[in-house]
């Protein structure tokens, strides 16, 4: 009997096929998205999904874990080597779960978090009031100046007033390098833990293309997808054995039950890919590509928050335009270019409308595109935004994008 999705559930299979077509024919430029390695997808689709393994390697609450123990141990050892950390927990189901576990490990209810404001480039889990991180704990926020950069002296003064228990550094939309050394000095000045959330830049960090948060951060969290190109999931890293014990208890039995062993296998496979020499070439290209894109947009008289980028993303500001981030997102989407609307420093519109868009280079770099291709894309983005209500132009560019994308197909089938 044929147990394939195609035979057993054609309705779902057909939608997966259409998504494959979209990924191949559109330009995926959402900064948090990437194209996962086929080898990782194979691991995620394996029979490991059948195995319950509550606990940690060689200390499980279930029998029959001799093989998954070894797989998790491989994932841990590879992550330690990648990030230069002494201790790693690879069980968090996501970056948000990783952050929640860290808070559970080091904070008591109503302790204080000082994190980057969501509207300035932070993340929901850094204390936003709509998140449990802003409901279980007292949350306070720092932001960026109008130039799009953190003022560390100002942050130091704010920390003296707030006296946080943990200072969170990390972002979902910040275009410059973080000064982890300075952040640690600020945390130490008020007796706070420094937690680094490097979910967005982890793939650059492990390649030496972005500052390493160690040895400055007490604890580091990350996702395993985004710039790492691994499976959707999270990880927690530290060099402190006492903190590691607290983190492990917070993950299990604190906020999670059984780990997802098929995903942990995917993490192990992904980390092996990240350890290859080719990974450094990819990460360097990610940065070169976003800079090539930025140069074109600046030449076309578009304003970029902070004037450019040190990482994998740029933020376009439309404060001086008569259209919004939502308008730009829609127009570019109609032309086959996928970005996302984003709040920016000095924001004057609601978070549902915004005055900016966020654009990233990781996914298209994974498809083999280089500076020349990003320059072409930059011109097309500017053409669309110059005449944002011209739907005929959007249709024309969509056809060009489809033709352009044929040379950069990354997957030949939808299921691995």
UniProtKB/Swiss-Prot annotation:
Keyword Transport carried by entry: no
Enzyme Commission number(s) of this protein: 2.1.2.1
Residues the record lists as N6-(pyridoxal phosphate)lysine modifications: 226
Gene3D superfamilies per UniProt: Aspartate Aminotransferase, domain 1, Type I PLP-dependent aspartate aminotransferase-like (Major domain)
CDD domains, per the entry: SHMT
InterPro entries: PyrdxlP-dep_Trfase, PyrdxlP-dep_Trfase_major, PyrdxlP-dep_Trfase_small, Ser_HO-MeTrfase, Ser_HO-MeTrfase-like, Ser_HO-MeTrfase_PLP_BS, SHMT-like_dom
Assigned keywords, A-Z: Amino-acid biosynthesis, Cytoplasm, One-carbon metabolism, Pyridoxal phosphate, Transferase
Domain of life: Bacteria
Subcellular location: Cytoplasm
Binding site for (6S)-5,6,7,8-tetrahydrofolate: 118, 122-124, 242, 350-352
Residues at the site labelled Plays an important role in substrate specificity: 225
Record has Glycoprotein as a keyword: no
Major subcellular site: cytoplasm
GO MF term (any one): glycine hydroxymethyltransferase activity
GO cellular component assignments: cytosol
UniProt pathway: One-carbon metabolism; tetrahydrofolate interconversion; Amino-acid biosynthesis; glycine biosynthesis; glycine from L-serine: step 1/1
Cofactor(s) listed: pyridoxal 5'-phosphate
PANTHER family per the UniProt record, alphabetical: SERINE HYDROXYMETHYLTRANSFERASE
The protein's assembly and partners: Homodimer.
Family (UniProt): Belongs to the SHMT family.
Protein name: Serine hydroxymethyltransferase
Organism expressing this protein natively: Helicobacter hepaticus (strain ATCC 51449 / 3B1)
């Amino acid at each position: 009997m044929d147990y394939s999705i195609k035979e057993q559930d054609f309705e779902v299979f057909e939608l997966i096929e259409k998504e494959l077509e979209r990924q191949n024919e559109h330009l995926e430029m959402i900064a948090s998205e990437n194209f996962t390695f086929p080898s990782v997808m194979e691991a995620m689709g394996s029979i490991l999904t059948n195995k319950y393994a509550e606990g940690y390697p060689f200390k499980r609450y279930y029998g029959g874990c001799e093989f998954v123990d070894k797989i998790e141990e491989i994932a841990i050892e590879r992550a330690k080597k990648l990030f230069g950390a002494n201790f790693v927990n690879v069980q968090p189901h996501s970056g948000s779960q990783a952050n929640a576990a860290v808070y559970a490990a080091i904070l008591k209810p109503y302790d204080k978090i000082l994190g980057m404001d969501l509207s300035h480039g932070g993340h929901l889990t850094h204390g936003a009031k709509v998140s449990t991180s802003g409901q279980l704990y007292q949350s306070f926020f720092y932001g960026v100046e109008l130039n799009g950069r953190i003022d560390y002296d100002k942050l130091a003064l704010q920390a003296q007033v707030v006296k946080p228990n943990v200072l969170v550094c990390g972002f979902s939309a910040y275009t410059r390098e973080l000064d982890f050394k300075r952040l640690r000095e600020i945390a130490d000045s008020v007796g706070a833990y420094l937690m680094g959330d490097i979910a967005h830049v982890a793939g650059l960090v492990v390649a030496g293309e972005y500052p390493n948060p160690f040895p400055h951060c007490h604890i580091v969290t990350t996702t395993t997808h985004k710039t790492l190109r691994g499976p959707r999931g999270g990880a927690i890293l530290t060099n402190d054995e006492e903190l590691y014990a607290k983190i492990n208890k917070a993950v299990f039995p604190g906020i999670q039950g059984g780990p997802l062993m098929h995903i942990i296998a995917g993490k192990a496979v992904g980390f092996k890919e990240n350890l290859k020499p080719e990974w450094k070439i990819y990460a360097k290209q990610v940065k070169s590509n976003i800079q090539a894109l930025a140069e074109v947009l600046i030449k076309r008289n578009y304003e970029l928050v902070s004037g450019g980028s040190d990482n994998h993303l740029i933020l376009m500001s439309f404060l001086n335009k008569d259209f919004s981030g939502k308008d730009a997102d829609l127009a570019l989407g109609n032309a086959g270019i996928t970005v996302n609307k984003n709040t920016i420093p000095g924001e004057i519109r609601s978070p549902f409308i915004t005055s900016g868009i966020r654009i990233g280079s990781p996914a298209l770099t994974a498809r083999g595109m280089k500076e020349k291709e990003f320059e072409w894309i930059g011109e097309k983005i500017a053409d669309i935004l110059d005449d944002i209500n011209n739907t005929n132009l959007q249709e024309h560019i969509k056809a060009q994008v489809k033709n352009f994308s044929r040379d950069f197909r990354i997957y030949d089938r939808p299921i691995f």
